[in-house]
Amino acid sequence: PLGIENDEIFDFQTQHTAIRIPLNQVIYIETSPQKHYVILHGTNNQMTFRANLKDLEKASPSLVSCHRSYLINPNNIIRINKLKREVEMTDGSICPFSRTKAKMLMDTFKRRNLQ
């Protein structure tokens, strides 16, 4: 079963492996070209495992869906380009976002910067 115990730890299991990562080290998660797999991009590593984004999104309210193929950690956003519909992450990665997610992303980014 997949799951995130709390806002501090991203905790998930595959058939043969159990992995725990501090949530602040999760930059984003994207769907893999390999069916039924996702790729987690972390600050120190990248992992591919069997899962789907909908289950991960339900398990972790801290991660937000910016596009049907991406879940991002809003704490790791450094820039949002509304014209190109791109989010730049702390590791330099660029993630696309859909038009329907633009307002939610901007609001989340502004709220985070006010804290």
Description of each model-found segment:
Residues 56, 104-105:
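DNA major-groove recognition helices of helix-turn-helix
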Residues 1-90, 94:
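Conserved binding/recognition cores within well-folded domains
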Residues 105-115:
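C-terminal output/interaction extensions
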